[in-house]
Regions:
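The DNA-contacting recognition helix of HTH DNA-binding domains
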Residues: 46, 98-100
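Ser/Thr-centric signal marking residues that sit
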Residues: 101, 110
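Membrane-proximal linker segments that couple transmembrane helices to downstream signaling/catalytic modules
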Residues: 1-89, 93, 105-108, 115-116, ...
Length: 123
């Protein structure tokens, strides 16, 4: 087993592809998303993506994906009529597989609970 090393240029290229896929295809809405799925979407190997996350971006795959999920939740709150959804249903639409995981990541990311965010952002 050899360690994958990627140049800064290669990391920048992969990150650009990854950002494009995340923003346009929203694979993070799949609660069962694996890093191998993301690697396939951007046409790279899993260990290259792992290097990108751990060495270049200094974060885990799950932290990266959950950042997008939290942002998606915020977008839904701001752009749609959420009154007919429960918090659990909204979190599932964003790709979280459990309410507990959603609350934990949301609070870690924003410093407030999802309910507080909704209260502060509903017009």
């Amino acid at each position: 087993y050899k360690t994958t090393r990627l140049s800064d240029e290669e990391c920048k290229r992969l990150l650009k592809l990854l950002t494009n896929v995340m923003n346009n295809e929203k694979p993070y809405t799949n609660p069962n998303l694996k890093s191998s799925d993301l690697a396939a979407l951007i046409g790279t190997k899993s260990h290259s993506l792992s290097f990108l996350f751990n060495q270049y971006m200094k974060k885990t795959f799950y932290d990266y994906v959950n950042e997008y999920r939290v942002e998606e939740f915020k977008r839904l709150v701001n752009e749609t009529d959420i009154s007919r959804y429960t918090l659990t249903a909204l979190s599932e639409k964003c790709g979280f597989s459990s309410r507990a995981s959603f609350f934990r990541h949301f609070k870690a990311s924003t410093g407030i609970t999802p309910s507080e965010y909704i209260k502060n952002n509903l017009r």
